[in-house]
Protein backbone atom coordinates (compact mmCIF):
# COMPACT_ATOMS: atom_id res chain seq x y z
CA UNK A 1 0.00 0.00 0.00
CA UNK A 2 2.68 2.51 0.94
CA UNK A 3 4.48 2.00 -2.34
CA UNK A 4 1.27 2.84 -4.22
CA UNK A 5 0.62 5.91 -2.07
CA UNK A 6 4.17 7.13 -2.64
CA UNK A 7 3.81 6.60 -6.39
CA UNK A 8 0.53 8.52 -6.48
CA UNK A 9 2.03 11.28 -4.35
CA UNK A 10 4.90 11.59 -6.81
CA UNK A 11 2.53 11.76 -9.80
CA UNK A 12 -0.08 14.22 -8.58
CA UNK A 13 -0.62 17.37 -6.59
CA UNK A 14 -3.99 16.06 -5.41
CA UNK A 15 -4.36 15.02 -1.77
CA UNK A 16 -4.37 11.26 -1.26
CA UNK A 17 -6.57 9.37 1.16
CA UNK A 18 -5.66 5.69 1.43
CA UNK A 19 -7.90 2.71 2.11
CA UNK A 20 -5.94 1.17 4.97
CA UNK A 21 -8.33 -1.75 5.31
CA UNK A 22 -8.25 -2.99 8.91
CA UNK A 23 -4.87 -1.37 9.56
CA UNK A 24 -3.14 -4.59 8.51
CA UNK A 25 -3.58 -6.21 11.90
CA UNK A 26 -6.01 -6.64 14.78
CA UNK A 27 -4.16 -4.68 17.46
CA UNK A 28 -4.70 -0.95 18.05
CA UNK A 29 -0.96 -0.51 17.47
CA UNK A 30 -1.38 -1.95 13.97
CA UNK A 31 -4.00 0.66 13.10
CA UNK A 32 -1.78 3.43 14.46
CA UNK A 33 1.22 2.16 12.51
CA UNK A 34 -0.84 2.01 9.30
CA UNK A 35 -1.70 5.70 9.74
CA UNK A 36 1.93 6.68 10.33
CA UNK A 37 3.17 4.65 7.36
CA UNK A 38 0.51 6.05 5.03
CA UNK A 39 1.41 9.57 6.14
CA UNK A 40 5.12 8.93 5.59
CA UNK A 41 4.29 7.71 2.08
CA UNK A 42 2.40 10.93 1.29
CA UNK A 43 -1.23 10.35 2.27
CA UNK A 44 -3.13 13.13 4.03
CA UNK A 45 -6.00 10.85 4.96
CA UNK A 46 -6.86 7.22 5.43
CA UNK A 47 -9.59 4.85 6.51
CA UNK A 48 -9.61 2.10 9.11
CA UNK A 49 -12.39 -0.48 9.09
CA UNK A 50 -13.85 -2.60 11.87
CA UNK A 51 -13.67 -5.89 9.97
CA UNK A 52 -10.97 -8.51 9.65
CA UNK A 53 -10.91 -10.82 6.61
CA UNK A 54 -10.12 -13.86 8.78
CA UNK A 55 -12.30 -13.23 11.85
CA UNK A 56 -15.11 -10.96 10.71
CA UNK A 57 -16.32 -7.86 12.54
CA UNK A 58 -14.31 -6.77 15.55
CA UNK A 59 -16.33 -6.49 18.72
CA UNK A 60 -17.27 -2.89 19.36
CA UNK A 61 -14.76 -2.31 22.18
CA UNK A 62 -11.83 -3.55 20.11
CA UNK A 63 -13.02 -1.59 17.07
CA UNK A 64 -13.18 1.60 19.11
CA UNK A 65 -9.73 1.01 20.64
CA UNK A 66 -8.30 0.58 17.14
CA UNK A 67 -9.89 3.81 15.86
CA UNK A 68 -8.71 5.64 18.98
CA UNK A 69 -5.13 4.50 18.40
CA UNK A 70 -5.37 5.54 14.75
CA UNK A 71 -6.72 8.96 15.77
CA UNK A 72 -3.90 9.46 18.24
CA UNK A 73 -1.39 8.58 15.53
CA UNK A 74 -3.04 10.99 13.10
CA UNK A 75 -3.10 13.76 15.70
CA UNK A 76 0.59 13.19 16.38
CA UNK A 77 1.58 14.02 12.81
CA UNK A 78 2.98 17.42 11.92
CA UNK A 79 0.23 18.04 9.34
CA UNK A 80 -3.53 17.52 9.27
CA UNK A 81 -4.51 13.94 8.48
CA UNK A 82 -8.18 13.07 7.91
CA UNK A 83 -9.07 9.79 9.61
CA UNK A 84 -12.09 7.95 8.28
CA UNK A 85 -13.52 5.19 10.50
CA UNK A 86 -15.58 2.54 8.75
CA UNK A 87 -18.45 0.54 10.23
CA UNK A 88 -18.61 -2.46 7.92
CA UNK A 89 -21.80 -4.05 9.29
CA UNK A 90 -24.01 -3.61 6.27
CA UNK A 91 -21.58 -4.95 3.68
CA UNK A 92 -20.53 -7.85 5.91
CA UNK A 93 -23.94 -9.40 6.51
CA UNK A 94 -25.02 -7.56 9.68
CA UNK A 95 -27.65 -5.03 8.68
CA UNK A 96 -28.36 -3.99 12.27
CA UNK A 97 -28.63 -0.21 11.87
CA UNK A 98 -28.56 0.55 15.60
CA UNK A 99 -25.20 -1.21 15.98
CA UNK A 100 -23.82 0.66 12.98
CA UNK A 101 -24.90 3.98 14.48
CA UNK A 102 -23.48 3.11 17.90
CA UNK A 103 -20.16 2.17 16.33
CA UNK A 104 -20.02 5.40 14.32
CA UNK A 105 -20.88 7.47 17.39
CA UNK A 106 -18.11 5.76 19.34
CA UNK A 107 -15.64 6.27 16.48
CA UNK A 108 -16.52 9.96 16.42
CA UNK A 109 -16.07 10.19 20.21
CA UNK A 110 -12.50 8.84 20.02
CA UNK A 111 -11.37 11.12 17.22
CA UNK A 112 -12.44 9.94 13.76
CA UNK A 113 -12.85 12.90 11.41
CA UNK A 114 -15.12 11.19 8.88
CA UNK A 115 -17.52 8.30 9.46
CA UNK A 116 -18.19 5.71 6.78
CA UNK A 117 -20.97 3.14 6.67
CA UNK A 118 -20.82 1.33 3.34
CA UNK A 119 -23.88 -0.62 2.30
CA UNK A 120 -26.67 1.38 3.88
CA UNK A 121 -29.75 0.26 2.01
CA UNK A 122 -31.85 3.38 1.57
CA UNK A 123 -32.25 7.10 2.20
CA UNK A 124 -33.94 6.48 5.56
CA UNK A 125 -30.89 4.58 6.85
CA UNK A 126 -28.53 7.24 5.53
CA UNK A 127 -30.62 9.95 7.21
CA UNK A 128 -30.67 8.02 10.50
CA UNK A 129 -26.88 7.79 10.46
CA UNK A 130 -26.42 11.45 9.54
CA UNK A 131 -28.86 12.54 12.25
CA UNK A 132 -27.02 10.48 14.87
CA UNK A 133 -23.55 12.01 14.40
CA UNK A 134 -22.15 15.48 13.85
CA UNK A 135 -19.06 14.64 11.79
CA UNK A 136 -19.15 14.22 8.02
CA UNK A 137 -20.56 10.89 6.85
CA UNK A 138 -19.51 8.97 3.77
CA UNK A 139 -21.78 6.20 2.59
CA UNK A 140 -22.11 3.75 -0.24
CA UNK A 141 -25.38 2.04 -0.97
Regions found by a protein language model. Name each.
Residues 1-139:
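Alpha/beta enzyme core
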Amino acid sequence: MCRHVAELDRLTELPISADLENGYGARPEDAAQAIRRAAEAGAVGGSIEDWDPEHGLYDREQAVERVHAAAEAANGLDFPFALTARAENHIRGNSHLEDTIERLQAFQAVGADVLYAPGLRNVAEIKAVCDAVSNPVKCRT
